[in-house]
């Protein structure tokens, strides 16, 4: 079986000057592909809509559907519920039940069990994401013909078996269109489409910039296992940091996590702003994750619109401040291992939360 180290040998390191250029600010009307697990929750829809309503600032080449799945949560939740039903002690809870304790307790208080939770498989997640992308295009009054592509229905099985899909081929074709400049892939989910494209065509790293949101800052001491975008496809996640593709890393925890919005804000600035405003309002007030995680009184709580950070970085440098660092190793346990001798990576350290949402609100005012 091909190891990560062996797979990386197929990639020719970029000249440092070209890497620096690719990690600089995008030029006018940059070419963009959005790779999104759109139906995973409700944040991707905001990001896709914002991009569709901002086509005077970016050239949105297409949107590719990424798979998602919560199967990796299933065993932990079942074990947590069983432990609580058996009256496990605190030591047992800490070592065995772990991060699923709160979820399990809320489910039980709601009169439900782990059997009541749907754990979709990646192929179902991809299909739902594809259908959701079409709904967002329609709500924005934009034709999807020739611009929405089906993605991988599984996570990368091995480094010698990239998953062929419309999405992976579209990424390759756009990256090889070098006459039109680099293409920025705004990756908002797990990375099988991107990882497969890179493995199928290692030459594309000279004209591709991966803008990905996931995980903790690269200087964090924590395991990135809590990150849904990162943990689902570990092979592709590790490949991104090793292969030398220009990478703008947008940490979810502590950075993107600031992008919260409340019910009153939704009511005042989003609801009634065209068909897409009403659709985003519907998603917010019928958030499927409220039921899934047994969240009570959702009207008193905000929700993180994580994935708008990708579009924000594309549109305005002031929206997402960054610093130049080196690409860390992501080890098998999903911890960062820093190495100052590595190739460069651009990393976000903050967001201008209010300015970002104000931009979205202005765009919604123009929605059909």
List each model region and its residues:
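Extracytoplasmic/secreted proteins, especially bacterial periplasmic and envelope-associated proteins
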Residues: 46, 128, 132-135, 166, ...
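Extracytoplasmic/periplasmic, Sec-exported soluble proteins
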Residues: 39-40, 121, 125, 303
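Short gly/ser-rich anion-binding loops that grip negatively charged ligand groups
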Residues: 119-126, 157, 161
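A glycine-rich helix N-cap at a beta->alpha junction
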Residues: 85-116, 125, 132, 136-147
